[in-house]
């Protein structure tokens, strides 16, 4: 087992259940190549800023970055998750939830009372966020030539 993976055990009817917990940490400069394998939208000039401001997280399993989360502040005051991406091979196994939980805990510890995110309505992510307690709070359509996209759904959650 890699050093960057934790084990959580629980006694249960004369045997132990063991669950592997991936390491979730702030993104570091050394993660740049792995980061861009999952995030094709962040301008490279912004990566150093995410590292410096601790506005990015990586989920590491067996020494490999399998998920990322990055955020900024909406209206300079509300944490807004801009990107959550889990490698396809690891999707549907709870890693996204663990990344969101860590981010929400950190935001609450920093004194924030709510968080936000968004997703296009044609993506399954909206259902994921609702399961985590996020509420639909509006949306917008981008119909400017060259930037068109389906309705972007804004979601919010009190923490």
Per-region residue spans from a language model:
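Conserved acetyl-CoA-binding loop-helix of GNAT-fold acetyltransferases
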Residues: 92-105, 131
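Short glycine/proline-centered loop/turn elements that form peptide/ligand docking sites
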Residues: 96, 100, 122-125, 142-148
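Conserved GNAT acetyl-CoA-binding A-motif
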Residues: 107-119
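Conserved catalytic-core motifs of GNAT/GCN5-like acyltransferases
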Residues: 116-118, 135-152
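Short beta-strand-to-coil "C-cap" segments at the C-terminal boundary of structured domains/repeats
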Residues: 156-159
